[in-house]
Amino acid sequence: MEKASLNIAQTKEIPLTDRRMGLRGWKACSRPHLLGRILLFMSILFITSAELSSDVSSREVYMPIFNNKLSFKVPPIKRSLLLGAALYEDFEYSSNNSASDGAFCTVFNAGMNDASREVVFEIHVMDVLQEETDSSRFGGTSHERGRQSLGFSVFNNKNGDLLRSKKNLASGTSVIEVNPGNCNEFLICFINLVYDGSWSSIDTEKSVTIKMTYNDKLDPDMLLHLVNQMTPQVVKALNTVSDGLFQIVSDTTLLQMESDRRDINEATYSYLIVGFVSLMVAQLISNIIVTTYLIIKIKSNPSSHIKKKGL
């Protein structure tokens, strides 16, 4: 009986040992899978936090050079930090694609056979904060306070001739026309200058998208742009101005008004000289009259003490 119970106990003990060994083996095998899951979870958290902590400018999509279009950002530069006596607002051509310190330059190849065709640059500018900032905290950004400007210049990349330049390029869409002459390669430069050196200055980056085209290709796009911009308020203002101009022209008073104003402007100096000379003559005559009157008065009425002495 005791042997039988011992055998039963042994037979029951063997499966228990097997189960423990199997559990240990399962734990050992599951450790790599658990470690991989932890690493995957940490990588997902890292990517999510990186996306959430990105600033405003990183949310923009910047296109490569395709179809003569290029998008980029121009960082702000303090004007006071630019050393030297040179006027950094005025670009100077340089063969290494750098117009001046702090400028961003790029080269556009027109790729046209007829060099006399007019080239048109369509530029879209947008102000972008460098970080999540309350721009109204110190009274607005430097651009809103008129202390920041974007400069733009186009050079002939072969000989360095300045073809077109514009200071304080406005935000929004601007269309700039250039007569290239014999040039088919352009050096285009931007510089984002800030004239406010105070600690409360909130500077903005300039998000620039530039597209190069020709007049014949741009005409349909320009027509659509004008149609979209032709609001009822603009139409009313244009009608008011045109009615006033046509009324002046129809009354033939515009030329007469211009002639009268021109005569007044030309006669101003003569009137001034005549008036000054007349004033001096009047003052001299008045002095002579007063002096003569005093002399006559003194001679006609001698002093009383002179009469008493019998003189």
Swiss-Prot record:
It holds the Pfam family EMP24_GP25L. One of its GO terms (cellular component) is membrane. It is a multi-pass membrane protein. The chain crosses the membrane at residues 32-52, 271-291. InterPro entries: GOLD_dom. The keyword Transferase does not apply. The keyword Cytoplasm does not apply. It comes from the Eukaryota. Keywords: Membrane, Transcription, Transcription regulation, Transmembrane, Transmembrane helix. It is found in: Membrane. May be involved in the modulation of rDNA transcription. This is Regulator of rDNA transcription protein 6.
